[in-house]
Amino acid sequence: MQLLKQLFKKKFVKEEHDKKTGQEGMTLLEVIIVLGIMGVVSAGVVTLAQRAIDSQIMTKAAQSLNSIQVALTQTYRGLGNYPATADATAASKLTSGLVSLGKISSDEAKNPFNGTNMNIFSFPRNAAANKAFAISVDGLTQAQCKTLITSVGDMFPYIAIKAGGAVALADLGDFENSAAAAETGVGVIKSIAPASKNLDLTNITHVEKLCKGTAPFGVAFGNS
């Protein structure tokens, strides 16, 4: 912007000189330079604004996932089971139920990437039904999938990725027995199962394969 101001200042001085000498107007080269600088500045502003928006969305996602996780464990862990969720409709009702109980706000229930409520599934742990839960964040681009997992993955002991659609109960397996295979880039990539090959960002293969496939992606973050 400072360079742009200097150019206009020089142009003003030149115009004053031109008036005295009978010459007027900006050269074509000067016009091209000014327009080029304006284009670069505008592109930079747009890029910075988009990065700021993306950062805010990721922060919101992390806060919402943490709030939901805390609400679920405080409300249901002592009861021994989480409410059964046979499908996405039931999973959506579990989310709405936490809102109606005042455990989370309606804003915390929303997926910040698409504005709809996140689904909460209950699934087995060591073959016992409804002993674990998974919060699904759907409708992600590949870039959003990767950034979300690397941003909030440490908050959860279980992570599963679905490529080409939303997470369903059948994608979750067993919290304790479904081994992770992070080298595949999809499916269960983090688990407490003994044979798990959990996501390791120091493993270049894991980094390259993460969120492999076609968007939209869904990511399930689980705990028990």
UniProtKB/Swiss-Prot annotation:
Q: Which residues carry this modification: N-methylmethionine?
A: 26
What stretches pass through the bilayer? 26-46
Q: How does it sit in the membrane?
A: Single-pass membrane protein
Q: Name one GO cellular component term.
A: extracellular organelle
Localisation:
Fimbrium; Membrane
The keyword Transmembrane helix appears for this protein: yes
Q: Which domain of life is it from?
A: Bacteria
Q: List the disulfide bonds.
A: 145-211
**One Pfam family here:** TcpA
Q: Give UniProt keywords alphabetically.
A: Disulfide bond, Fimbrium, Membrane, Methylation, Transmembrane, Transmembrane helix
Does the UniProt entry include the keyword Membrane? Answer: yes
Q: Which Gene3D superfamilies match?
A: TcpA-like pilin
The record's annotation in InterPro entries points to: N_methyl_site, Pilin-like, TcpA
Per the UniProt entry, the propeptide covers 1-25
Q: What does this protein do?
A: Major component of the toxin co-regulated pilus (tcp) which is a type IV pilus essential for bacterial aggregation and subsequent colonization in the host small intestine.
- Quote the record's domain comment: The leader sequence region and some other sequence particularities suggest that TcpA may represent a novel class of pilin, and imply the existence of a novel signal peptidase.
Any idea what this protein is called? Toxin coregulated pilin
